[in-house]
């Protein structure tokens, strides 16, 4: 189980990303339209003004049950070992068992 502080930090990042989504998106569109280098630097400065944690690349997908940030399956929202336990317990329909 992940520490509660890490999960709260991730939720805070998700809220920041939603808040600054439009502010980040508009300068990215402008950079492609502008041809002069000085204008691109000005737009780049605007892009750096939002907080660092509002960038979507700083988000992790976490396991729905344990909060584990690695080895997640997007289709289920679960980490690998939890997914395996659920499949062996026949709680996920359509998934085939495997052993390793």
Curated annotation (Swiss-Prot):
Question: Does the UniProt entry include the keyword 4Fe-4S?
Answer: no
Provide one Gene Ontology biological process annotation. translation
**Main localisation:** plastid
Q: Which SUPFAM superfamilies match?
A: Glucocorticoid receptor-like (DNA-binding domain)
**What keywords is this UniProt entry annotated with?**
Chloroplast, Plastid, Ribonucleoprotein, Ribosomal protein, RNA-binding, rRNA-binding
Residue ranges crossing the lipid bilayer per the database entry: none
Q: Where in the cell is it found?
A: Plastid, Chloroplast
Q: Which domain of life is it from?
A: Eukaryota
A GO cellular-component term linked to this record: small ribosomal subunit
Pfam families with a match to the protein in the record: Ribosomal_S14
Annotated Gene Ontology MF terms? rRNA binding; structural constituent of ribosome
What is the role of this chain?
Binds 16S rRNA, required for the assembly of 30S particles.
NCBIfam families, A to Z? PRK08881.1
The UniProt family comment states:
Belongs to the universal ribosomal protein uS14 family.
Which HAMAP family does this UniProt record tie to the protein? Answer: Ribosomal_uS14_1 (MF_00537)
- Subunit structure of this chain's protein: Part of the 30S ribosomal subunit.
Its recorded name reads Small ribosomal subunit protein uS14c
Give the source species. Calycanthus floridus var. glaucus (Eastern sweetshrub)
């Amino acid at each position: 189980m992940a520490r509660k502080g890490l999960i709260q930090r991730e939720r805070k990042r998700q809220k920041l990303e939603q808040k600054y989504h439009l502010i980040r998106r508009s300068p990215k569109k402008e950079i492609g339209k502008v041809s002069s280098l000085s204008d691109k630097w000005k737009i780049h400065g605007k892009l750096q003004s939002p907080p660092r944690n509002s960038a979507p690349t700083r988000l992790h997908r976490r396991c729905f049950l344990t909060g584990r940030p690695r080895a997640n399956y997007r289709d289920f929202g679960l980490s690998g070992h939890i997914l395996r336990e659920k499949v062996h317990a026949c709680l996920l329909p359509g998934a085939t068992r495997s052993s390793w």
